[in-house]
Amino acid sequence: MESELLAFEHVTCSADSVSLNAVSFRLNRGENLVIFGPESSGVDLISPLIAGIIHFSGGDIYYKGRPIKNFTFSEELAYRKDLGYLQKDYGLINNMTVEQNISLPLQYHSQLSGEGIRDVVDGFVRELNLEHCRDFRPVRLLRSEALKTAYARAIALDPDLLLFEHFLEGQCLINAQTVLRSIERRFVSGNKSVIFVTYEPERFVSFADRFLMLDHGAIVFMGTRDDFLRADNEFLAQYMRSSTEGPMTIL
């Protein structure tokens, strides 16, 4: 039987003129979901809501069957360890090196010794080809190097749920292949779950089990990879054509 990991139940939220209106969806353990839509659609509220950065005004968000708003302090700490969040601006600490940024969650949320933390960081540095810049601070990094550093930090605690937010947009796709290969190897199969929030859903066809599209705070398409590729939905068809003609209102 499928095990539900995350659920939105009629979630309503407004922030900076963008809103979600009674949005509901579920994510099972081991399932990968792409959430997309135009600007002002509400897609950019999803990850901050899950991460607890912003708060919803109606409905509930459940993690492993428990409403996150009712978490005790210890449950909230466990939830944060279970959650890996790669933000669209990468969120690197400016006065820390690549190595220090990657090690940060391990220092605060693991029982590893200093040597154990170094071993984990060394593994990420080798896997992601960061040896040449491990002592650089973010200001010296190429955009692809910043992405790889933020990605390593997001997955350092081996979380059950990963949020990848617009992480490829503005990237050189050749240089980003190292991260994409790592995602495929680590998360496409198994019991980890990934939510990709993006304006470019076609990039994630090989990774995703399901696709969900928002427009003006409401779900207008939800389906499997095959449903997405057929594009029978009028909102989806307009979006994939980048057309001004269709049911969506263009800003």
Residue ranges and their predicted role:
Residues 51:
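Helix-to-loop junction immediately C-terminal to a conserved catalytic motif
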Residues 115-133:
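Conserved ABC ATPase "signature" region
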Residues 216-217:
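Conserved ABC ATPase "signature" C-loop
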